[in-house]
Design a protein with these regions (language model features):
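Alpha-helical membrane insertion/targeting regions
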Residues: 1-167
């Protein structure tokens, strides 16, 4: 399947870029002292997610190993990554910085599932889980865990937490 193969490599490149690029986005030094870098890297992150990362993730979700539910989870991840990134873009365009920051935290939490999945997968490997169960459990924990951590970070920093869902 050449389309899958190309999608896979594009998705991997996009994910690696997004993880590295986002590190500059959460730096208070860069935000305050080098705002142009923040803006340029932010625009690039959004472009890479919306054009490369999320669409290839959605395509590959149809072929993911595991059960129907794991394929649905991969679809959800791709769609939520796209949606949260789009909301981050929309909210900064109307100068709603708090909502922008919160939506981008959510977006980054989806990008980071690639990392947390591998950490859990390695951890459960040492507990002698069979490969498929390890894969499924690691996937669910990484996605739900990252989403919960993102919401906790947003909640902890925000006095108007619920308003960011409406922005």
């Amino acid at each position: 399947k050449p389309v899958y193969k190309y999608s896979f490599y594009i998705h991997i490149f996009a994910g690696m870029f997004c993880i590295v690029a986002a590190l500059t986005q959460f730096s208070s030094y860069i935000l305050k002292k080098r705002k142009a870098i923040h803006i340029w890297m932010g625009k690039t992150y959004v472009l890479v997610v919306l054009v490369l990362g999320a669409p290839t993730g959605l395509y590959m979700s149809f072929f993911a190993k595991g059960s129907f539910w794991e394929r649905m989870l991969f679809m959800f991840m791709a769609l939520y990554w796209f949606y949260s990134t789009m909301k981050g873009l929309q909210t900064i365009k109307v100068k709603n910085v708090l909502a922008h920051k919160n939506w981008m935290i959510r977006s980054y939490s989806m990008a980071m599932t690639a990392v947390t999945f591998r950490v859990y997968h390695l951890l459960f490997y040492y507990f002698d889980f069979d490969h498929l169960h390890n894969y499924e459990i690691s996937l669910w924990i990484s996605v739900l865990g990252n989403m919960l951590v993102a919401e906790y970070i947003i909640y902890r920093k925000s006095k108007s937490y619920l308003k960011t869902f409406l922005a």
